[in-house]
């Protein structure tokens, strides 16, 4: 254990693991924001399409995800680099997965994309379990939408956030 703990490679791998774990936690607030948007959709068909569109990455196998992102993050013809080239008006060639300084960013993008739908679904279930009477009472008391969100929605979503945090770290 002494040799292992003194090894710079071991320390670097632990640091990289922590960075990737923390970066993957960005999917929790993103999933919550998307769930708030999905919760506001009243058309059942549109809501189903919305949920399916965001949950699809959880259904797709890992090999398919790798192939999709290999195409999206390519250096010369990747979708992200092409979009950046069109926006900036010059050829952009960023090695999202080949440049050692950017591999954590590329891996984090993939991780966030694959967990975003699951986080959205858990948050959506939590949002739909909040009694509407609480919002109605707060409206009668004169609370605006931000105060209702801050004092009703966020506190009642706490257990969902804790669950997503723990499963996200694992």
PLM feature spans:
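A structural signal for multi-pass alpha-helical bundles of membrane permease subunits
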Residues: 1-170
């Amino acid at each position: 254990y002494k040799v292992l703990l003194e090894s710079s490679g071991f320390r670097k791998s632990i640091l990289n693991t922590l960075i990737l774990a923390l970066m993957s936690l960005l999917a929790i607030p993103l999933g919550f924001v998307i769930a708030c948007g999905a919760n506001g959709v009243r058309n059942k068909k549109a809501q189903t399409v919305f949920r399916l569109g965001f949950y699809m990455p959880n259904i797709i196998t890992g090999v398919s995800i790798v192939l999709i992102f290999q195409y999206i993050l390519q250096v010369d013809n990747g979708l992200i680099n092409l979009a950046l080239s069109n926006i900036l008006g010059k050829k952009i060639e960023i090695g999202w997965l080949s440049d050692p300084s950017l591999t954590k960013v590329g891996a984090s993008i993939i991780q966030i994309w694959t967990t975003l739908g699951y986080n959205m679904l858990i948050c959506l279930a939590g949002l739909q379990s909040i009694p509407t009477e609480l919002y109605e009472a707060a409206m009668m008391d004169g609370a605006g939408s931000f105060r209702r969100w801050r004092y009703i929605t966020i506190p009642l979503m706490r257990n969902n956030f804790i669950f997503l945090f723990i499963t996200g770290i694992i």
